[in-house]
């Protein structure tokens, strides 16, 4: 248990991923107390976002993932989330529990579940957190939710640049603030988020750029324009599956007009696996035997079509799979990659950190062209950090996929980190930790909350994330507030407006009743027809009020009495919380996760000016002759 400090503030973020849920406990100082600091570092503190602290042992993971409760959503809180919160109770002083917000942010696995199952699980978590209400839960729809890939990418960008101190010593009068671009490659998707250095590119692509608002301790507003995009199906594992399916689908018997010979070839050669290695792959209920042929050049060329560079874009420059983005100025826009960018480079090739194309491609070539027995012998010697054999079999493909994404997908130049035009930072570097702290998007979420809790400064702008205009139009995506109580303020404002409206209508109704009851003789003479209508209306109201006094079934519904009929309608009304209604937008939001396959009608809607062929031999002219690498 921590030594209690009344100025401490705590926050909890649970990353509910596909394989498991990991809780993160964070701490920062009350910003009001920092305003009165008088030490020599006070000026720097005031011009920075709150300092978020996390000890190494303030995280804990529980397997399997939240999505595993799809058959028993009612058990998700007690069996999965409560043990994580019990872990947090051993860190956070009890006096701080009620003021400690909990964010349960579900990602990969939950995104794949049907909407009704998502809602059932999340609604059960909301009820579990509120009864009993040990931690701060203001709004379930904002705190317990499935987040899309873009939101996850923006949180990752926030967490990355916070760890590098790019939100500290902020001068609002300076327009040029450096930040790192964020690249993340998981098993299912890949993401990019960066603040373009070129203001002209921001202006040209304004409708594609999100805006992040932070607040320094002294109240100064920090405004960051960030482009973000995510590609579902372009993660390392899903790309591998698409690649093997491509090998099968290109067989002659699978492309002719005869169905009786489909899948007659069950043995295939894979240039992206080391020679002598083998594996089985199931495709359309058929098992295929894959044998490695170990050819680096052929592997690189075979992978290139998976980027779908031929997909039409509605604007330029075009990245891949029909996604356009602001032009990346690699002379000034520098990037950091995590997850697969780090694991592949570091665990297999010992080349994590600053990226060097020549060194990485040479090591990858040697590995891909090696015999499987030699790779196993190296593994026994500890060369590959004790990576399991099935991971080693995929390492050649994953290394090539990383190269293709970086240089063909994002058009990153193939230059060394010590080249003259790289300035003082490398074009790209892969990391797992920054200053001994794990790089996690959860840090970005709690930073947004802590920054939004600052009371100093102008209230004209709320701390949070404003989605791009395009996302708002296409999916209805809304502003993500940093501070939970913003919703309370909005409700208060709405309530205030409602009260004013109620008073106005009440005054009008009083005037009407005065005319009806006190000047009815005038009304009858001049507006006898209108009077009769009014009289009938009053009679109907009296009858309705009499009925309502006798029975109010809908009020009983609100109280939870669902066992009785409601005017003969049985089992028609299904009770849902506000969070369940809000979650209906998540499926639309996922459309931004650019799936690798798109229907013809969708492609036609993009109205491209220039269509590129899928690929031709000209596409391979960029690959150097293998003799140049030997």
Swiss-Prot record:
Disruption phenotype: Cells are partially resistant to E4orf4 and can partially suppress the spindle checkpoint defect in CDC55 deletion mutant. Does not suppress the rapamycin-resistance of CDC55 deletion mutant. YND1 and CDC55 double mutant is fully resistant to E4orf4. Deletion mutant suppresses the synthetic lethality of triple mutants, where UPC2 and ECM22 are knocked out along with either HAP1, ERG6 or ERG28.
Location(s), subcellular: Golgi apparatus; Membrane
Cytoplasmic side: 518-630
Subunit structure: Interacts with activator subunit VMA13 of vacuolar H(+)-ATPase. Interacts with CDC55; this interaction is disrupted by adenovirus E4orf4, which remains associated with both YND1 and CDC55.
Region of interest: Disordered: 586-606
Role according to the record: Catalyzes the hydrolysis of phosphoanhydride bonds of nucleoside tri- and di-phosphates. Has equal high activity toward ADP/ATP, GDP/GTP, and UDP/UTP and approximately 50% less toward CDP/CTP and thiamine pyrophosphate. Has no activity toward GMP. Required for Golgi glycosylation and cell wall integrity. Together with CDC55, required for adenovirus E4orf4 (early region 4 open reading frame 4) induced toxicity, the apyrase activity is not required for this function. Plays a role in sphingolipid synthesis.
Lineage: Eukaryota, Fungi, Dikarya, Ascomycota, Saccharomycotina
Record GO biological process: CTP metabolic process; protein glycosylation; sphingolipid metabolic process; UDP catabolic process
EC number from the UniProt entry: 3.6.1.5
Cofactor note: A divalent cation Ca(2+), Mg(2+) or Mn(2+).
Organism: Saccharomyces cerevisiae (strain ATCC 204508 / S288c)
Residues spanning the signal sequence: none
Protein name as annotated: Golgi apyrase
Regulation: Activity is inhibited both by interaction with VMA13 and by V-ATPase acidification of the lumen. The activity of VMA13 is not required for YND1 inhibition.
Cofactor requirement: Ca(2+); Mg(2+); Mn(2+)
